[in-house]
Amino acid sequence: MPARLEGLHDHTPQPAPTKPRPPPDDKVSFLCDVHYEALDRKLTDLEIAGIVHAMIIGGLETTQYALEEQAQLLCENPGTFEHLRTDRAKLRNFVEETMRMRSPTHGLSTRMTSQDEVFQGVDVPAGSLLHVRFGAANVDEEEFSCPFDLDLDREAVTRHVTFSAGPRVCPGANLSRIEQQIAWGVLFDRLEIIEYGADNDWLHQPGIMLGTLRLNLAFRKAETPLSLGTGRNATRS
């Protein structure tokens, strides 16, 4: 090494850690910096872990179970797969209608009554805890005619409360809708049919979620794949 560069190698790494670097932009780092205004403090590790856990459930399992239940409804309604495969005009309706029929999240919101009430003939004392069930509301015969029938022409197809409503509506609702439409667009392009496979045990995830732990499907790959996608600005190949 030339004399003029002696000692440079030892010096170079030293200032590197002190130089400014772009702040991390991941969600966990963001949560670590959040100031909890209500209690005037940072979030605890337990609170951060709980938020991350809820994000995984809300961002993955809900859409996963929606797709799984939609596959079941396609198996149980002959002709619907082929109809949607060749005509994507009702794909959005299919996603909304199936989420209404089999809400991936059956209920999340728990409320405490502030006064005595009578609900559908049942006395509910003040201080009672009520668990609001989205799944039950979505098949209410007073709100939806023939609620257990898959109707791709149902009016006001987004009236369901699968994503809750009001100030507590799911912030990822529209993302989930897009994910489902894209997923089925790809599957309709590549497959000709899906059917129930063998050895399904129909064991469901316990708790507030609706979804089987395993779903075996049989399918036939399309000899001539389509390229209709979600039906927007697409053509046949």
Residue spans for each PLM region:
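Cytochrome P450
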Residues: 1-237
